[in-house]
């Protein structure tokens, strides 16, 4: 039985997700920024359905999260997906934006950080995202650090992703996570991946090849009293990956140009991502779809392994 508070006044559960949590089925939370900001309509809705299908194929239930009418949507119906995909101007909601958007009663597309807030409130221990935010290059001057990293220290949710984007300072990102005692586990890989690239050039703190051992590690982390996330990474499929050196060269050149044009803060990330997409002649589109699907599938697999592990523990 779930410990979820289904009467929480800030949560609106879909019937499917409510039943799954109530009966102890594995559930995977998903963000809605990819729907409202990632792709044009109707491609965005079709992509969201593919991501949900990848979770279902592994035996888990997807719970796409959004904000509407003063509550978090925990799981979206087809009508919800269509509305979020076709409505223009939905603001991107990170952790700091949640109270204002909830109070105004408007719509909000959840990021990694805000999705973790909702997943934790809803009692969903797994979340999938293609890639996380991190410490930006030049953060020693700008102090530009993604809210994702801060939220990892506050939410008891296992985050499955393909690492962080190469446009970030991945060395400092890993240092920050180490300082905050956030475990990093790379599934069937020795390296910390970098979204489009199979390796960031940095060795992962832990490699685990067994889903049950990962499930046990997550359980141990929370049994120790930690209130933070566990980060589980898995690299993009080799056939869809873009070379690390190629991407790094593009980013360095684009970063210089961005600085010259005075592009900083929130505008820097989309600027650099567009530069990579243009220079690789659209290879990033295929790569992005690949990591969206593969991380969702792995999250579904690990959520099932976690449920099985907990059931075995309860029977012991």
UniProtKB/Swiss-Prot annotation:
Gene3D superfamilies referenced in this protein's UniProt entry, alphabetically: Indigoidine synthase domain (3.40.1790.10)
EC number: 4.2.1.70
Residues reported to bind substrate: 92, 112, 146-148
Induction summary: Moderately expressed in the wild-type strain. Expression is repressed by the HTH-type transcriptional regulator PecS. Weakly induced under oxidative stress. Expression is 10-fold induced during infection of Saintpaulia plants.
Key word Lyase present: yes
Entries under Pfam families matching the protein: Indigoidine_A
GO cellular component, one term: cytoplasm
Signal peptide: none
Binding site residues for Mn(2+): 144
The reaction(s) this protein catalyses: D-ribose 5-phosphate + uracil = psi-UMP + H2O
SUPFAM superfamilies: Indigoidine synthase A-like
Root EC class: lyase
Keywords on record: Glycosidase, Hydrolase, Lyase, Manganese, Metal-binding
Cofactor annotation: Mn(2+)
Biological process, per Gene Ontology: nucleobase catabolic process
Family: Belongs to the pseudouridine-5'-phosphate glycosidase family.
Function: Catalyzes the reversible cleavage of pseudouridine 5'-phosphate (PsiMP) to ribose 5-phosphate and uracil. Functions biologically in the cleavage direction, as part of a pseudouridine degradation pathway. Part of an operon that could be involved in the biosynthesis of the blue pigment indigoidine, which is implicated in pathogenicity and protection from oxidative stress.
Subunit and partners: Homotrimer.
Name this protein carries in UniProt: Pseudouridine-5'-phosphate glycosidase
Species of the source: Dickeya dadantii (strain 3937) (Erwinia chrysanthemi (strain 3937))
Lineage: Bacteria, Pseudomonadati, Pseudomonadota, Gammaproteobacteria, Enterobacterales
Gene from which this protein is expressed: indA
């Amino acid at each position: 039985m779930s410990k979820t508070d289904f009467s929480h006044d800030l949560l609106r559960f879909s019937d499917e997700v409510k039943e799954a949590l109530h009966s102890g089925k594995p559930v995977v939370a998903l963000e809605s920024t990819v729907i409202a900001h990632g792709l044009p309509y109707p491609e965005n809705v079709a992509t969201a359905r593919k991501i949900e299908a990848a979770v279902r194929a592994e035996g888990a239930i997807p719970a796409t999260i959004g904000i509407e009418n003063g509550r978090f949507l925990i799981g979206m119906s087809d009508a919800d997906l269509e509305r979020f995909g076709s409505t223009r101007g939905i603001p991107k909601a990170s952790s700091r934006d949640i109270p204002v958007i909830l109070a105004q009663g408007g719509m909000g597309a959840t990021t990694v950080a805000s999705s973790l807030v909702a997943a934790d409130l809803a009692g969903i221990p797994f979340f999938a995202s293609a890639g996380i935010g991190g410490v930006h290059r030049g953060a020693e001057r700008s102090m530009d650090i993604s809210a994702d990293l801060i939220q990892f220290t506050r939410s008891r949710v296992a985050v499955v992703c393909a690492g962080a984007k190469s446009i970030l300072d991945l060395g400092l990102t890993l240092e920050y996570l180490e300082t905050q005692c956030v475990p990093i586990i790379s599934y069937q890989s020795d390296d910390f991946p970098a979204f489009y690239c199979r390796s960031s050039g940095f060795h992962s703190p832990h490699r685990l090849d067994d889903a049950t051992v990962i499930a046990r590690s997550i359980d141990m982390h929370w049994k120790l009293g930690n209130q933070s996330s566990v980060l589980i990474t898995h690299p993009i499929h080799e056939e869809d990956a873009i070379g690390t050196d190629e991407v790094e060269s593009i980013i360095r050149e684009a970063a210089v140009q961005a600085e010259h044009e005075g592009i900083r803060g929130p505008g820097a990330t989309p600027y650099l991502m567009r530069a990579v997409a243009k220079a690789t002649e659209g290879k990033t589109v295929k790569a992005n779809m690949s990591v969206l699907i593969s991380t969702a599938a792995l999250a579904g697999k690990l959520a099932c392994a976690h449920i099985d592990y907990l059931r075995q523990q309860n029977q012991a």
